[in-house]
Amino acid sequence: MKITRKAATQRRHRRIRRKVFGTPERPRLAVFRSHRHIYAQVIDDVAQHTLVSASTLDRELREAFKDIGTATREAAAVVGRSVAQRALQAGICQVVFDRGGKLYHGRVQALAEAAREAGLQF
């Protein structure tokens, strides 16, 4: 039986999560991508607590998406910069990147590169 795209993504995500674990010193930057939006959270897996987050649904970022839309690489870069700035304000400078089972390509890659440029280390 052929594996569906969703099943392949879930399989990759389980494989990644076995290896990627966020600690208080180096939390996990988790990315979730849907067809219309992208979400990023910095998570402490020990305390099971989200430290900072950003998404294309944030009220503060909505003005940036008026012209570019929410399902673009540019929107993902805005979210990446935003989550990096919020993490740095919270005193977090190093994270572990969790691409959420998605391929490191397109919007996921744009978010990661923007977060790196904004000062997060991973």
From Swiss-Prot:
Keyword terms: Ribonucleoprotein, Ribosomal protein, RNA-binding, rRNA-binding
GO-annotated biological processes: translation
Pfam families listed in its UniProt record: Ribosomal_L18p
InterPro entries, alphabetized: Ribosomal_uL18_bac-type, Ribosomal_uL18_bac/euk
GO cellular component: cytosolic large ribosomal subunit
Domain of life: Bacteria
Gene Ontology MF terms: 5S rRNA binding; structural constituent of ribosome
Cited function: This is one of the proteins that bind and probably mediate the attachment of the 5S RNA into the large ribosomal subunit, where it forms part of the central protuberance.
HAMAP family referenced in this protein's UniProt entry, alphabetically: Ribosomal_uL18_B (MF_01337_B)
Oligomer and partners: Part of the 50S ribosomal subunit; part of the 5S rRNA/L5/L18/L25 subcomplex. Contacts the 5S and 23S rRNAs.
Family: Belongs to the universal ribosomal protein uL18 family.
Protein name, per record: Large ribosomal subunit protein uL18
Taxonomic source organism: Synechococcus sp. (strain JA-3-3Ab) (Cyanobacteria bacterium Yellowstone A-Prime)
Lineage of the organism: Bacteria, Bacillati, Cyanobacteriota, Cyanophyceae, Synechococcales
Gene name of the encoded protein: rplR
